[in-house]
A protein has these predicted regions:
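Generic beta-strand/beta-sheet core signal
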Residues: 116, 187, 195-196, 207, ...
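Phosphate/diphosphate-binding loops
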Residues: 173, 221, 228-229, 233-237, ...
């Protein structure tokens, strides 16, 4: 009998990914990567992986699950080296499977490299066809990029003597062909390389250790290992870290540079202790609540936030409107993102496994309930029912972002437009569907002002439908896996040979 997997995050955008790269001679780089990935666990919980090099070979360990599930003292001890990269993954192109776990490894033409990716390419099918790749042999956009780079390195190896900079030159050739969202960390035996797409959809920053350098998706990944924040990697920038220090080059045409950081990094994705555009994410979320209170005040007894990312906005709302803030929902911190339930009756209990009401806060009170977003509405509706049962007199829902009406193709998994509640219902209809006494969303202008960045440049396509990079009509999460043909056996066998080194390393370490 088939069991269904029920998500606890139906009313929030699904995670992006987290990447880290560390160059630190004399330091336990595998352990530093492990700690930094812990700080980025919120960005992806499907799989985790680390690749390291001792200057002669690359070793990769990756598996499905959380960072703490994949790594232990024994696996980390097997990851020798003074440089390494890591990734926590949530699938946005390609299914959730070991084959698509990262870092992606290639070892052809006597040149090894590994790649970690946060984002989502929008021209994958075009790139695969241009490269003459057999449909079905590439199952994620990250794997596709690695294949393109490997082919370019192979082409150069046939015409030039090796000087150790083949990966850098291969990237300079391949990167201008890529469209969409990508923050990459890459490594060969001697270099760590970081790349941010010309729009800067996903964050990437540079930090300094006493004896090395760090690249990471968010600043807490620097803090946890004692690295000092230096700066954000600019949109369209490529940085190369080696024994000689840090170099920066611009591999993209200047006309493609158009900073549009995903605004939902401020709303939901990033940790509250992250700095983006030099601004505190936590303080930005508090300001969102303050703007929301000015925009949509209501008479109430208590303001409460939906854990976790709704809490700072709720605190800001309460402060501005001068109504007491109180915790009204307790989150089970040890529940996974999904659980397996055999029938609808048990599936309907999903929200109760994640959240439990504090009746002393709720019973007999008029509540303002603040959350960061509503995507599908199923979890919010179940939560409202739970609050009613706990004795709420009134429930006024306040959302610290505008209505989520359009799917994201730049590194978030939001489903199709038909699944998005605000794309199909008016605000009044959503209010009726949720069974709340009132509903209000923060305006886009107020959201952007709350970030405190002086309109530094944001993508808000999921709110407006204005996509900064063109989207193919047939783009989907599994576009590379849903190709016309399955790979022939000979090609599949060849791919096993190509990736055999990484699989052998993985199995040996986990024996």
């Amino acid at each position: 009998m088939a069991h269904d997997e029920t998500s606890f995050d139906d009313d929030s955008p699904r995670e992006a990914c987290g990447v880290v790269g560390i160059y630190a001679p004399g330091q336990p780089v595998a352990h530093l990567n492990y700690l930094s990935l812990y700080a980025l666990q919120h960005r992806g919980q499907e799989s985790a992986g680390i690749a390291t090099s001792d200057g002669e070979r690359i070793t990769v360990v990756k598996d499905m699950g959380l960072v703490s599930n994949v790594f232990n003292d024994r696996t980390l001890a097997g990851l020798d080296g003074h440089l390494g990269i890591g990734q926590t993954r949530y699938s946005t192109t390609g299914s959730s499977s070991w084959r698509n776990a990262q870092p992606v490894y290639r070892g052809e033409f006597q040149r090894e490299f590994a790649l970690g990716h946060n984002g989502n390419l929008t021209n994958t099918e075009e790139l695969a066809q241009e490269a003459g790749m057999l449909p079905g042999t590439i199952t994620s956009d990250s794997d596709l990029v690695a294949e393109l780079i490997a082919n370019q390195i192979g082409h150069e190896s046939n015409h030039n003597a090796s000087d150790g900079r083949e990966l850098e030159r291969g990237l300079v050739k391949i990167l201008p062909k890529l469209e969409g969202a990508f923050s990459f960390v890459l490594m060969d035996e001697a270099h760590i390389i970081g790349v941010r797409d010309p729009n800067g959809f996903r964050p990437l920053c540079l930090g300094k250790l006493d004896n090395g350098w760090v690249l990471a998706s968010e600043t807490p990944a620097l803090d946890i290992i004692g690295a000092h924040f230096v700066r954000e990697i600019d949109p369209g920038e490529m940085v190369i870290i080696s024994a000689t220090g840090v170099r920066s080059i611009q591999p993209f045409p200047v006309e493609r540079i158009n900073p549009t950081l995903c605004v939902f990094e401020f709303v939901y994705f990033a940790r509250p202790d992250t700095q983006l555009y030099t601004q505190s994410v936590h303080h930005a979320r508090v300001r969102m609540g303050q703007f929301l209170a000015k925009q949509a005040p209501v008479e109430a007894d208590v303001v409460m936030g939906v854990p976790e990312s709704g809490i700072p906005a709720a605190e800001g709302y309460a402060k501005e409107i001068k109504i007491p803030y109180a915790q009204g929902l307790v989150k089970n911190r040890y529940i996974g993102r999904t659980f397996i339930a055999p029938n609808q009756e048990l599936r309907s209990l999903g929200v109760r496994m994640k959240l439990n009401p504090l009746r002393d806060t709720i019973s007999g009170n008029r509540l303002v309930v603040v959350d960061d977003s509503i995507v599908r509405g199923t979890t919010t509706r179940a939560m409202v029912k739970m609050l009613r049962e706990a004795g709420a007199k009134e429930i006024h829902m306040r959302i610290s972002s505008p209505p989520y009406r359009w799917p994201c193709f730049y590194g978030m998994d939001t489903g199709t437009r038909s699944e998005l509640l605000a794309a199909n219902l008016t605000v009044q209809e959503i209010q009726d569907y949720l069974d709340v006494d009132s509903l209000a969303y923060l305006t886009l202008d107020n959201l952007l002002e709350a970030t405190g960045t002086n309109n530094a440049g944001f993508c808000s396509a999921c709110l407006t439908g204005d996509y900064p990079v063109d989207i193919p009509v047939n783009l989907s999460k599994k576009i590379l896996e849903e190709s016309i043909h399955k790979p022939e056996k000979s090609s599949a066998t060849q791919r096993e040979k190509i990736s055999g080194g990484i699989q052998q390393s993985f199995s040996e370490i986990h024996e």
